[in-house]
């Protein structure tokens, strides 16, 4: 840190006030390479030299100390507080002073501010003299100047410096969202207003007296940051870019983006029709507590006849199989959607007593057994396990060793079982034949009612009755009426008149038949 003292004589503001000597102490750090910040303050060029003062020894002096953070303090012996113009007289000629011209840029950042010294070249194209009317001082404008632009990435704390050539004396619009840059050096005639902005995605605008504006862009394209949306947690809201509208996006997990396969209500069952091999369409079953019934539950279900249990007991087949009652003979039924609360309470009570109450009773056998078997076994005592209320016989499986039945006849070599099975098979075959016959008869009747009368062919030609058209019938009737009038004029008897009319009708029919024969033998005449 080196301190450069300088004394500058200030002109009096009014003729009555005396001159004031101002001492400026410039504090410049040794290392000023890294320049970071958002607010840029540009000081006018300082020309090194000595002060030509005409003040008296009693002239008050003012000392100003300038450091990295700006003006630290000032001591003023005079009461004058208004800003005055500072006149600096060069020590030598203007050309020599230009060579030693030093410009200091104070860049104020978030935490610290640093100085960067720019020394332009003293060549002829780089120096432009400005003549100001009414001024005895020489002003020099720096034509080509370079400034350090700082691009700070929000991800890392270490700033990176990017140097870009900028044009002179033009307003600058700096976008501070991805990149922060410094302001170029302009001449002392331009008045600058630097507006500090907080660190947020806004733009910093530096206005000057000239109306033209230009945007500072880096020489190399900046890498676009593409976020990995797959690693974002659920519920993250993606804000839209500025100027693209108010549409926002939210990240949802994959299990939420699914299409509903079921509607808000459950269709109980469809109308049963006697078609197909089974003869009865089965109903869709509802799983209880995530338990899906096995393939044995696809058997036809007979309607229940409950009267006092409200269809909420396990001996109701509909309730035990996890189905709603539909087309049943039960009375005061609660096994429907209208009494869902009572139904759920009954299901919970049954599961508390027996956790496997609603599991299918007919499941797979043990390992190595391909046949199905009852999960608990039947408890038949008098039916011999040959009635439909035996669950093993109803499922068309044989009783196993876990059954507790008495007098069981539902085993492999039982003659009664074979007879009943044969009868059941014969009855099933008979029902299928009757159903097929009814279906065939109904289809034939519907075909006769819907299909048009086919045109019967006789060797590729038309039959004689197809020639009996409306015109032919009218002509035949006229002939018959003419014969009746002729018989009346001649005074023929009734029998003779009828005979004449019938003979005329036969002649007309023969003419139609002859015409059909001619058309059959001569296709060209028929087509014509």
Curated annotation (Swiss-Prot):
It is found in: Nucleus. The modification N6-acetyllysine is found at residues 23, 28. The record marks 353 as: Interaction with DNA. There is a cross-link at residues 136, 418, 438, 440 (Glycyl lysine isopeptide (Lys-Gly) (interchain with G-Cter in SUMO2)). SMART domains: CXC (SM01114). GO terms for biological process: regulation of DNA-templated transcription. Residues 302-315, 378-391 are annotated as: DNA-binding. Zn(2+) 4 binds at residues 378, 380, 385, 390. Zn(2+) 5 binds at residues 378, 392, 399, 403. It comes from the Eukaryota. One of its GO terms (molecular function) is metal ion binding. Zn(2+) 2 binds at residues 304, 318, 325, 328. Zn(2+) 6 binds at residues 385, 399, 405, 408. Residues 148-167 are annotated as: Disordered. Zn(2+) 1 binds at residues 304, 306, 311, 316. This is Protein lin-54 homolog. It comes from Pongo abelii (Sumatran orangutan). The lineage of its organism: Eukaryota, Metazoa, Chordata, Craniata, Vertebrata.
């Amino acid at each position: 840190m080196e301190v450069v003292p300088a004394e500058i004589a200030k002109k009096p503001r009014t003729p009555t006030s005396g001159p004031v000597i101002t001492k400026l102490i410039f504090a410049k750090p040794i290392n000023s390479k890294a320049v970071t910040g958002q607010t840029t303050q540009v000081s006018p060029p300082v020309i090194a030299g000595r002060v030509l003062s005409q003040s008296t020894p009693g002239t008050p002096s003012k000392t100003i100390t300038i450091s990295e953070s700006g003006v630290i303090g000032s001591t003023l012996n005079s009461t004058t507080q208004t800003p005055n113009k500072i006149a600096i007289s060069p020590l030598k000629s203007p050309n020599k002073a230009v060579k030693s011209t030093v410009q200091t840029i104070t860049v104020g950042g978030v935490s610290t501010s640093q100085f960067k010294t720019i020394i332009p070249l003293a060549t002829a194209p780089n120096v432009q003299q400005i003549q100001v009317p009414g001024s005895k001082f020489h002003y020099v404008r720096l034509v080509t100047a370079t400034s350090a632009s700082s691009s700070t990435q929000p991800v890392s704390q270490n700033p990176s410096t990017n140097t870009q050539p900028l044009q002179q004396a033009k307003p600058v619009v700096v976008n501070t969202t991805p990149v922060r840059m410094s302001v170029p050096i302009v001449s002392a005639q331009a008045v600058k207003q630097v507006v500090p902005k907080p660190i947020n995605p806004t733009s910093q605008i530096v206005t000057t007296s000239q109306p033209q504006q230009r945007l500072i862009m880096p020489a190399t394209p900046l890498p676009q940051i593409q976020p990995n949306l797959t690693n974002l947690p659920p519920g993250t809201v993606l804000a839209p870019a500025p100027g693209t509208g108010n549409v926002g996006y939210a990240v949802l997990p994959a299990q939420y983006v699914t299409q509903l396969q079921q509607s808000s209500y459950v269709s109980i069952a469809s109308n049963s029709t006697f078609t197909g091999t089974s003869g009865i369409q089965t109903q869709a079953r509802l799983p209880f507590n995530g338990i899906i019934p096995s393939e044995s539950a696809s058997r036809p279900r007979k309607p229940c006849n409950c009267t006092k249990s409200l269809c909420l007991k396990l001996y109701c087949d509909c309730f035990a199989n996890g189905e709603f009652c539909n087309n049943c003979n039960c009375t005061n039924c609660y096994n429907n959607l209208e009494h869902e609360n009572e139904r759920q309470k009954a299901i919970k009570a049954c599961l508390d007593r027996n956790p496997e109450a609603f599991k299918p009773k007919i499941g797979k056998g043990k390992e190595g057994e391909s046949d199905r078997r009852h999960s608990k076994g039947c408890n038949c005592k008098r039916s011999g396990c040959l009635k439909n209320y035996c669950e093993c016989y109803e499922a068309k499986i044989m009783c196993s060793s876990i059954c507790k039945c008495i007098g069981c006849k539902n085993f492999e070599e039982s003659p009664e079982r074979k007879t009943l099975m044969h009868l059941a098979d014969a009855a099933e075959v008979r029902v299928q034949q009757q159903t097929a016959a009814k279906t065939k008869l109904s289809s034939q009747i519907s075909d006769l009612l819907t299909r048009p009368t086919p045109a019967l062919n006789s060797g590729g030609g038309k039959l004689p009755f197809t020639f009996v058209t409306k015109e032919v019938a009218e002509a035949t009737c006229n002939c018959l009426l003419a014969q009746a009038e002729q018989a009346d004029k001649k005074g023929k008897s009734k029998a003779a008149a009828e005979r004449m009319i019938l003979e005329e009708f036969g002649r007309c029919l023969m003419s139609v038949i002859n015409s059909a024969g001619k058309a059959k033998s001569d296709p060209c005449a028929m087509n014509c």
